[in-house]
Swiss-Prot record:
The gene is cobS. It is an enzyme of class 2 (transferase). The lineage of its organism: Archaea, Methanobacteriati, Methanobacteriota, Thermococci, Thermococcales. It is found in: Cell membrane. Keywords: Cell membrane, Cobalamin biosynthesis, Magnesium, Membrane, Transferase, Transmembrane, Transmembrane helix. It holds the Pfam family CobS. This is Adenosylcobinamide-GDP ribazoletransferase.
């Protein structure tokens, strides 16, 4: 899976672009690499732990998905036909909707991380990466970018292996603490973002998949917060 890591993280290793297409099954496994540092910060309960944990997460994964969320939100909020929405999403300038979406996602994550178990960030990242895989499984690319290139290579075997890895990582956490089962709802929040993308744009590109990743992560943290506090 070393070839897929450079596409989803800032971990300084070299990956082969063509080989990465054959490692899409490893998307859920990437959460094992992206969540330990923020989880450790939360576990140690250092001052401003939730802020530092989130900063460490984005230091690890980069800001590409967050940028995609901003572009996605701009496209979603534009009134008009599909062409206008796609044009707004591809505009290099970030609009008010994009800024609002990014700020909202960041604030919800910071707030939620103060109220959930330290390992909740792992569940959130696991759901986030699996939701990206499910988004690509729609096989409805928008344009001919990286998203389309990966979708073309995603077959049933890769999807099956990715699902098995997701379950192998997810189930032990649920067995250890059944209340964490509520986190599964976060995955459906991400899938709803996929539906919104298809309804508005007719397909998915890298921005859409990045938005799905961000929305799934924050959605998972929010539902875990509600599950543990109600």
């Amino acid at each position: 899976m070393k070839n897929i890591l450079p596409f989803l993280t800032r971990i300084p290793i070299k990956g082969d672009f063509e080989k990465a297409r054959r490692e899409l099954w490893a998307f859920p496994l990437v959460s094992v690499f992206t969540s330990p540092l923020p989880a450790l910060i939360l576990y140690l309960k250092v001052p401003l732990a939730s802020i530092l944990a989130l900063l460490s997460l984005y230091f690890t994964i980069g800001l590409l998905h967050l940028d995609g969320l901003a572009d996605w939100a701009d496209g979603i909020m534009v009134k008009g036909d599909r062409e206008k929405k796609i044009k707004a999403m591809k505009d290099i300038n970030v609009g008010v909707a994009g800024i609002f979406a990014v700020v909202t996602v960041l604030m919800l994550q910071i707030y939620s991380l103060q109220l959930v178990p330290f390992y909740a960030i792992f569940l959130a990242e696991l759901n986030s990466k699996f939701a990206m895989l499910l988004a690509m499984a729609t096989k409805k690319p928008l344009g001919k970018g990286l998203g389309a290139y990966f979708m073309e290579a995603l077959d049933r075997n890769q999807l099956l292996y990715g699902t098995l890895i997701y379950l192998l990582l997810y189930i032990p956490v649920i067995i250890a603490e059944p209340r964490n089962l509520v986190s599964f709802l976060g995955l459906f929040i991400g899938l709803y973002a996929v539906k919104i993308s298809l309804d508005n744009f007719g397909g998915l590109n890298g921005d859409c998949i990045g938005a799905v990743a961000e929305i799934t992560r924050v959605g998972t943290l929010v539902v875990i917060t509600l599950g543990w506090r109600i």
